[in-house]
């Protein structure tokens, strides 16, 4: 009788072992990529909350000490005099957003570029102003590259300085 060879593997056994190793490796690569994507999403969400909170502090300080107000044709406040971020002609400043999603006041950045990690974008919108109580209402929105909202807050700030109103325009 013939005895089986004990040493070594046959070609079929080698191919089966290689297929198992490849399947396990592919599963690990997929798992790691999903974990990295989930981690990046989580970090971006946390950074969005930090950015929103930081902008909330800066915007509330600016609105609290706002001077002369600027109204549009509909009577809505669109700008104000800011001592910290005056417009180029020292008139009323407005909250705007540049092409990269950085918040500007009077054409000047409120925060440095590295305050917007992971491609975060932000905007500030003045929703209203109550002349009797001198309370501003503003909305701060932080989005990702794709425009999905990651953080948003609405704040109400009482203006300390009694403003001298300016005409529309």
Q: Where do the model's predicted regions map?
A:
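Aliphatic-rich helix starts adjacent to a transmembrane/signal segment
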Residues: 2, 6-61
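Type IV pilin-like appendage domain
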Residues: 69-137, 146-149, 161-169
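Extracellular and select intracellular beta-sandwich modules with Ser/Thr-enriched
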Residues: 151-153
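Short beta-strand edge segments in extracellular beta-sheet folds
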Residues: 156-160
């Amino acid at each position: 009788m013939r005895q089986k060879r004990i040493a070594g593997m046959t070609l079929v056994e080698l191919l089966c072992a290689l297929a198992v190793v490849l399947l396990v490796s592919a599963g690990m690569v997929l798992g790691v990529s999903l974990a990295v994507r989930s981690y990046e999403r989580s970090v971006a969400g946390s950074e969005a909350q930090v950015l929103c909170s930081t902008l909330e502090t800066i915007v509330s300080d600016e609105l609290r000490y706002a001077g002369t107000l600027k109204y549009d044709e509909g009577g809505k406040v669109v700008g104000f005099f800011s001592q910290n971020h005056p417009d180029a002609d020292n008139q009323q400043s407005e909250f705007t957003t540049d092409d990269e999603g950085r918040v500007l006041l009077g054409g000047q950045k409120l925060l440095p570029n590295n305050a917007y990690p992971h491609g975060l974008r932000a905007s500030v919108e003045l929703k209203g102003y109550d002349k009797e109580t001198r309370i501003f209402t503003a909305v701060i929105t932080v989005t990702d590259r794709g425009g999905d909202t990651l953080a948003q807050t609405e704040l109400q700030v009482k203006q300390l300085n009694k403003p001298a109103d300016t005409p529309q325009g």
